[in-house]
UniProtKB/Swiss-Prot annotation:
PANTHER family: PARVALBUMIN, PARVALBUMIN ALPHA
Matches recorded under CDD domains: EFh_parvalbumin_beta
Sites where the protein binds Ca(2+) 2: D90, D92, D94, K96, E101
Organism whose genome encodes this protein: Merluccius merluccius (European hake)
Descriptive protein name: Parvalbumin beta 2
Example of a GO MF term: calcium ion binding
Keyword rRNA-binding: no
PROSITE patterns: EF_HAND_1, EF_HAND_2
């Protein structure tokens, strides 16, 4: 799904680094997968993949399964990790993350 945007080796390394429950840190993950240095267009493409229901927002249930976008066998985020991730990205407080909020969070 991320071919041409992100390298498989970077994704594998990033997933390995947050395998343990409670170890997911979005900033570190975005850096490890190489997303931080990507263009706005590429970040928007990644957002489109994560936005599974195509609502133009990433909601809490999609964040919980965030890692599974990168590997089907990846773990779900814990409730605490999901809440922290949502809070970090949801700058307008509407309970979901839009594409501009996502881009701002990635660039961090």
């Amino acid at each position: 799904a991320f071919a041409g945007i992100l390298a498989d080796a970077d994704i594998t390394a990033a997933l390995a680094a947050c395998k343990a429950e409670g170890s997911f840190k979005h900033g570190e993950f975005f850096t490890k997968i190489g997303l931080k240095g990507k263009s706005a267009a590429d970040i928007k493409k990644v957002f489109g993949i994560i936005d599974q229901d195509k609502s133009d927002f990433v909601e809490e249930d999609e964040l919980k399964l965030f890692l599974q976008n990168f590997s089907a066998g990846a773990r779900a985020l814990t409730d605490a990790e999901t809440a922290t991730f949502l809070k970090a990205g949801d700058s307008d407080g509407d309970g979901k993350i839009g594409v501009d909020e996502f881009a701002a969070m990635v660039k961090g």
